Amino acid sequence: MAIEGLMKQGFVTTSLNNVINWARTGSLWPMTFGLACCAVEMMEAGSSRYDLDRFGIVFRPTPRQSDLMIVAGTLTNKMAPALRKVYDQMPEPRWVISMGSCANGGGYYHYSYAVVRGCDRIVPVDIYVPGCPPTAEALLYGIIQLQDKIRSTNTIART
């Protein structure tokens, strides 16, 4: 009788949600999609000075092993189909961080005929990291914001 009361209140599913989201935030495996100068700052964030390993972040070489894509730099019209193809190869759940002014909205090259004005026109973006180029600290802050977003999602019972 007591367990049925807990089940009706959603206690068990809420606790399971917390455990699943905790595990997801502690094991983000990003796939780097470096397109321009922002990729240098993304590589800097992976260095020993910032130590992304303490957040459980391990860069993966293939999209089939990753659950986070970091788009860093200017996305051109010619590269957009490749970005979408790589995104489609990632397993669910998957997240995208758009890093830099060019990836967010075209940046300096906004009025160029060959530039996509924001990678959110190609793939759904979860976190935007502003800057030209954004610092490694800004990317680290964006990753922390993504972890907070993952913790607040409802994984088991979607409403």
Swiss-Prot record:
- What terms describe the molecular function in GO for this protein? 4 iron, 4 sulfur cluster binding; iron ion binding; NADH dehydrogenase (ubiquinone) activity; NADH:ubiquinone reductase (non-electrogenic) activity; quinone binding
| Source organism, top-level taxon | Bacteria
Mind telling me which Pfam families this protein's record contains? Oxidored_q6
Write down the required cofactor(s).
Answer: [4Fe-4S] cluster
Substrates-to-products reaction catalysed: a quinone + NADH + 5 H(+)(in) = a quinol + NAD(+) + 4 H(+)(out)
Report residues binding [4Fe-4S] cluster.
C37, C38, C102, C132
- Name the top EC class: translocase
Query: Which GO terms fall under biological process for this protein?
Result: aerobic respiration; electron transport coupled proton transport
Q: Does the keyword Transport apply?
A: yes
EC number(s) stated in the UniProt entry for this protein: 7.1.1.-
How is it placed in the membrane, per its record?
Peripheral membrane protein
A single cellular component GO annotation: plasma membrane
Predominantly, its location class is membrane
Cofactor notes: Binds 1 [4Fe-4S] cluster.
Q: Where in the cell is it found?
A: Cell inner membrane
Q: Which UniProt keywords apply?
A: 4Fe-4S, Cell inner membrane, Cell membrane, Iron, Iron-sulfur, Membrane, Metal-binding, NAD, Quinone, Translocase, Transport, Ubiquinone
Q: Which PANTHER family match?
A: NADH DEHYDROGENASE, NADH DEHYDROGENASE [UBIQUINONE] IRON-SULFUR PROTEIN 7, MITOCHONDRIAL
Assembly mode: NDH-1 is composed of 14 different subunits. Subunits NuoB, C, D, E, F, and G constitute the peripheral sector of the complex.
Q: Which HAMAP family match?
A: NDH1_NuoB
The task this protein performs is described as: NDH-1 shuttles electrons from NADH, via FMN and iron-sulfur (Fe-S) centers, to quinones in the respiratory chain. Couples the redox reaction to proton translocation (for every two electrons transferred, four hydrogen ions are translocated across the cytoplasmic membrane), and thus conserves the redox energy in a proton gradient.
Q: Which family does it belong to?
A: Belongs to the complex I 20 kDa subunit family.
| The protein's name | NADH-quinone oxidoreductase subunit B
Q: What is the lineage of its organism?
A: Bacteria, Pseudomonadati, Pseudomonadota, Gammaproteobacteria, Candidatus Pseudothioglobaceae
Instruction: Name the encoding gene, please.
Output: nuoB
